[in-house]
C-alpha cells in the first residue's frame, strides 16, 4: 500500500480541529496507526489501535466518524490507513497529519507506558 499514490483521500485536520471534535462530545473513533509497541508507549487518550498495515479494522463501522493519526508528519502509516479506509468505503475519514508529536507540542494529554504521569 503506497500512501503517496493518487486516489481517494481523507480530509486533513489539524490540532485545533481535533481538539474541537473531542470537546464537542459527539461520538467518533480516534485511531492510532502504529506498531503494538508504539501504541502502548504513547497515544492520545481514548485512541483505538490499528496496525501500520491497516489489517485490523474490526471495531470500525463504515458510517463511523474516524480520525486517523500516527507519530508525526513524516510517518506514512496514518496516511496509508486513512487512504485504505476511504478505498474500502468508509465515509467519514479524517487524517490528523501532525500526529502525536504535534499533539504533545501543544501540551495536550497523552497516555501510555511512556506518558509523563504529571499530565
Where are these regions (language model features)?
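A short, well-structured beta->alpha microelement
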Residues: 13-17, 46-55
Amino acid at each position: 500500500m503506497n500512501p503517496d499514490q493518487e486516489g481517494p483521500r481523507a480530509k486533513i485536520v489539524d490540532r485545533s480541529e481535533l481538539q474541537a471534535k473531542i470537546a464537542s462530545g459527539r461520538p467518533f473513533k480516534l485511531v492510532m496507526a502504529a506498531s503494538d509497541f508504539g501504541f502502548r508507549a504513547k497515544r492520545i487518550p481514548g485512541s483505538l489501535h490499528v496496525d501500520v498495515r491497516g489489517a485490523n479494522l474490526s471495531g470500525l463501522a463504515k458510517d463511523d466518524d474516524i480520525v486517523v493519526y500516527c507519530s508525526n508528519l513524516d510517518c506514512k502509516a496514518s496516511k496509508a490507513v486513512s487512504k485504505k479506509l476511504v478505498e474500502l468505503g468508509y465515509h467519514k475519514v479524517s487524517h490528523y497529519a501532525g500526529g502525536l508529536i504535534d499533539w504533545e507540542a501543544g501540551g495536550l494529554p497523552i497516555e501510555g507506558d511512556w506518558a509523563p504521569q504529571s499530565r
